[in-house]
């Protein structure tokens, strides 16, 4: 990756950056940071993965995906550059290099960059970020054998640099020595250096209070569902303050958080019936979805789940984590992937949990059927994978 960047003129040095890693919450935190910076009047790039509907979603400037023409132009140019290198470039390396080139050419002042996998050896880690953020350490990308949490933490914290501020959302005290062993100008820990002072469900989101190293913020409405999003907002606010070296004006925070859209993350895209999209891509994310449904959508009945999942996910485990059971409906669908789990297998697992289940040929068909089952007062939850969410979002959003 370094060779590819050097042959491209090292565009990653043309802008400042905030680098975000962690098992869950990377995308939401990155979106929140980008919105806070944009509300401050900065020209902001955001690089994320994976995408839901279009690959251009991965590279945004001021909240808008880059054009297909610009995306194709830069990827093709970089593919030609990569051919001159003795080291072949991977798909993700080409996309990352294209993002950095686009940010440089388009005059981005700060890029918010989401790690692809882990961190230390990730393609994104050629930037010298001003602020590094580690959201948490969960069970994704690991077989959970041996000292896996310490190993994963050591890889993720590898995005920290000697002159950067490291903002840590993970609160396990047994991992603190790993974070402290990495080079950084300063370390900030959740629950010690910054914390939530209030967290209440509200209509269309949550009402939060924050204590950060630079100030107190009270009665902040965040347009996002779930207590996990409160933690992401806290991390985003702290990281943004550290980047700017100042507290943020209350009106900037209110604007950024109050107008937030988190695509595919407890995202409500329709009413009558309510239709909610959430990828819930690992056990922790599935449990977070359960909490969101139990708290923010408890009065919505019946609940109809459109489930489309990929191997090697265990449908029974997912159904248990999300809390699907008696009284719920499940419409199981195939997604557009060779790894798609057979809908009948998902339906069998749902029925074993006490739900009423049926199958559909694809996600579009499943959503149409789910809307009928839900009626005007119910809720349709599209989940199980980002593939299912992306296909539904293309139909609905």
Where are the predicted features?
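Nucleotide phosphate-binding/pyrophosphate-handling subdomain across enzymes
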Residues: 14, 105, 110-115, 122-133, ...
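ATP-dependent carboxylate-amine ligase catalytic core
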Residues: 3-13, 39-127, 139, 143-146, ...
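Short internal beta-strands
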Residues: 165-170, 304-307, 328-336
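Short Gly/Thr/Asp-enriched flexible loops that form oxyanion-binding sites at enzyme active sites
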Residues: 33, 119-130, 393-396
């Amino acid at each position: 990756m370094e060779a590819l960047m050097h042959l491209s003129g090292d565009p990653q040095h043309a802008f400042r950056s905030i680098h975000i890693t962690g098992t869950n919450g990377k995308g939401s935190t990155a979106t929140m940071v980008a919105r806070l910076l944009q509300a401050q009047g900065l020209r902001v790039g955001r690089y994320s993965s994976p995408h839901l509907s279009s690959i251009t979603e991965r590279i945004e400037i001021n909240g808008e995906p880059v054009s297909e023409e610009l995306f194709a132009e830069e990827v093709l140019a970089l593919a030609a550059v990569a051919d001159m290198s003795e080291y072949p470039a991977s798909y993700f390396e080409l996309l990352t290099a294209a993002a950095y080139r686009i940010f440089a050419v388009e005059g981005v002042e700060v890029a918010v960059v989401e790690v692809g996998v882990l961190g230390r050896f990730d393609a994104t880690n050629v930037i010298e970020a001003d602020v590094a953020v580690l959201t948490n350490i969960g069970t994704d990308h690991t077989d959970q054998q041996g000292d896996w949490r310490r190993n994963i933490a050591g890889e993720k914290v590898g995005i920290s640099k000697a002159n950067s501020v490291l903002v840590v959302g993970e609160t396990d005290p047994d991992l603190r020595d790993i974070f402290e062993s990495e080079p950084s100008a300063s370390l900030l820990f959740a629950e010690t250096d910054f914390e939530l002072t209030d967290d209440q469900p509200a209509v269309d989101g949550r009402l939060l209070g924050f204590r950060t190293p630079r100030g107190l913020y009270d009665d902040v409405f965040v347009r996002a569902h779930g207590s996990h999003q409160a933690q992401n907002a806290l991390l985003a606010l702290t990281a943004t303050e550290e980047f700017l070296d100042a507290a943020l004006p209350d009106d900037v925070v209110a604007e950024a958080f109050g107008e937030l859209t988190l695509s595919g993350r407890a995202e409500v895209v329709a009413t009558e019936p309510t239709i909610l999209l959430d990828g819930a891509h690992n056990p922790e994310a599935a449990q977070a979805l359960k909490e969101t449904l139990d708290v923010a959508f408890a009065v919505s009945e019946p609940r109809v789940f459109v489930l489309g999942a990929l191997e090697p996910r265990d449908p029974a485990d997912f159904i248990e984590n999300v809390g699907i059971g008696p009284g719920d409906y499940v419409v199981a669908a195939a997604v557009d992937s060779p790894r798609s789990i057979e809908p009948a297998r998902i339906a069998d697992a749902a029925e074993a949990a006490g739900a009423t289940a049926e199958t559909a040929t694809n996600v579009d068909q499943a959503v149409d059927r789910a809307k009928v089952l839900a009626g005007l007062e119910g809720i349709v939850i599209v989940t199980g994978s980002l593939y299912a969410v992306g296909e539904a979002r293309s139909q609905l959003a």
